[in-house]
Amino acid sequence: DQLHELVDRSNAAYLSCNFDNLGTAATEFSPYTIETYGNVRVAYVGISTPESLTKSNPAHFKDASGTDIYGFCEDETGQMLYDRVQQTVDEARANGADYVVAIGHLGQSGVATRWRSDTVIANTTGIDVLIDGHSHEQYEQRVANKAGRDVLLAQTGTQLQTYGEVIIHPTTGKIE
């Protein structure tokens, strides 16, 4: 299919903790990766919007008979998505991540509330930063997670109009 053809041509890593092959019950891509910078280990967790099933071409997610072959942990409450993200963050932490940076394609404006980036943060713990996309907005905000801890949430708009930089100060734990 087209997505896998593009992925095969790319040199980039593709991450998504919630893009599932419904036939195999496996994720299509690695859910996260851990990179080491000096003595600091940072996990990058990929999160895909469940709206991919309706806001892109739905035929790409079905077989020839029209049966869904992919899913994004979509449900009416958002709990499936929150559970998968939490499971992935916990696994990354258990595997030695000092910090967790979620790379999301979730958005806020025009997105179902249960799948918004700020809602995912509010229903999980352990994410330090969420760098967002999908809704093509520019924002930098702090959102309280499920434990009441502030998480940096940022999105830089569209078409490289702006760019962002996240700085983690490992000696103080400050993130900006």
Where do the language-model regions lie?
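Acidic, metal/ion-coordinating pockets
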Residues: D1-E176
